């Protein structure tokens, strides 16, 4: 479990591709201070398992499905990435519940600075937006963000200058692809309500069927 509060940005040192999978070696300082084999670290919002490490770098394996569903294929040596260690039981909870299981990607279509905030318009699938709500939470490349605008195929988030300077938001431009994880609570609620509606519909059909057939 993560919070969406990025601890530091790391630098891609090496990318090893094997078939449809890959291994990433990432230079970092803070997240490697107490790292152990098997630890979970969110890389641009994606929960990945540490398979090797040294003093100032660590390696993670990326499965084919993760490569396909995220923006990791766009990384190259020298790319910056957002990093967050899994939340400890006694840690502070500063963002929102983030699983590290990315739902898909979005394209940045507009960036506008207003006063002390920067607004990002993100184009994404209606399959993702249907679980979102205004003023709700969404994770963008591992950053816990608040939704200020919402339509069937777009979301607007507002980011403060501190977050931009401390994360890879500072490298983003119109056309950039970002990883998206929708709010976990919203997804569960949508699933629950959708399944309840289906159950009611099925019950109505079944009762009508029996009635029409003399039962």
UniProtKB/Swiss-Prot annotation:
Annotated Lumazine-binding repeat ranges: 1-96, 97-193
Pfam families registered for this protein in UniProt: Lum_binding
CDD domains in alphabetical order: Riboflavin_synthase_like
Top-rank EC class of the record's enzyme: transferase
Binding site for 2,4-dihydroxypteridine 1: 4-6, 144-146, 158-163
Catalytic activities: 2 6,7-dimethyl-8-(1-D-ribityl)lumazine + H(+) = 5-amino-6-(D-ribitylamino)uracil + riboflavin
Binding site for 2,4-dihydroxypteridine 2: 47-49, 61-66, 100-102, 135
Name used for this protein in its record: Riboflavin synthase
Biological source species: Bacillus amyloliquefaciens
